[in-house]
Every structure is written in C-alpha cells, then in structure tokens.
Amino acid sequence: MAAPPTSPGTPISSKQELVEYIEAGCKPPADWRIGTEHEKFVFQNDTFLPAPYEGDWGIRALLEGLQRFGWEPVLENGNPIALQHANGCSITLEPGGQVELAGAPLEHIHQTCNEVHSHLSQV
C-alpha cells in the first residue's frame, strides 16, 4: 500500500497528467507482492456473545497465548492490543471486536495460503 500524500499537491488538469501521476506510483513487476487480511469474530460457544477482553477465554488471553509462537505484543497502558511478528505479519483488534491477521507482503498465493493456515492453527 502506498503512503498517503504529505501535501495537497497540484490539481490534475489533463488526462495525460493523470496517467503520469498513476504511472509514477507503479512498481516494477519484480517488486509486486500480495498480502492477506483475515478477520475473525471471537465469541463464546455457550452464549454466542462476543468474547470480553478480560477472562480465561477473553481477547487478552488469546493475544497472550499467541506470544508462544513468536508474536511480540503491542501494549497500551500495559494491555496487549495487537501483536507483531518478525516475519512481517501483525494481529490487530478491529473496531467491531474482531481479530485481524494482516499478512506479510508475499510473492504468490501459495505463500499466503500457508500463512493463513499457520495462523489458524495457532489461534
């Protein structure tokens, strides 16, 4: 994903300027990568209610348990709110309470498949 612009820039006033602007952001095919975003809603099996943050089966316990697979916690006021891995992946909490794997930039779909399967076996 490209970084957001740091200034408003000059307004585009022709089709050619638009084409040149888009072309300037293109990477050569050798640098192309794909990444996975995989969201999971965490809920309690017996009540089907969303899992709380605290508790034996809560989001905090899930994030802390995943650390045994090499995930490093991202803390806010001492509480884990995300995880990062040396391989370029991260696990984040989304606004709706879901847990998201943001995969590493990989070369092909078979690598993303392996990444998701590994993640799901850890969860």
Q: Where are the model-predicted features located?
A:
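Terminal catalytic/cofactor-binding subdomain
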Residues: 1-123
